[in-house]
Amino acid sequence: MSDAAPDAVVPGAQYAQTQFNIDPSALTGISTIDDTTKQLANTLARIKDTFEYTPNLGPQKYGVAIHAAFAKAVRAQGLPGIAPPDVETTFGGDRYGVKGSVRTDVILRNDVGDVVAIYDVKTGEKGIEPKRAAELRLKAGVGNEVPIIQMSFPYGLSRKNAILEGSFSVQTF
């Protein structure tokens, strides 16, 4: 079979999963982080393909369902540098919801246990603001050298930066 005469399309068949656009800003040049970013993007794409947004579900419940399924899938994968407690980790309090606490979706650690990347899933239109990126870094006890990688349905994957002199973010539109 050649490209000139492709196979017939079968109605109702699924041919490819959702693919996330990975903005170049989401890639760090560090293979451990970049390989994990790609694996997590594929995992989130598979999760997205299993959930259909319906108006009666509402955006908040849809987001909760996606986050829960993604967390379960990431824990089950056993990816290097991501232990089960590194998924939906709460910083700044004993439990999620405590005043002043923050929750990260996924933390990636190096071989000695240092946080080397923070991943945040977004299912709606709102992305990570520079103030939120700074708060995540502060509560996780890391500096600006640790990338915060936004995994967003509307915008793909992008990296968030917070600089002491000011703030900016890189978005894929």
Identify the function of each model-found stretch.
Residues 2-173:
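Catalytic toxin/effector domains delivered as secreted proteins or via bacterial secretion systems
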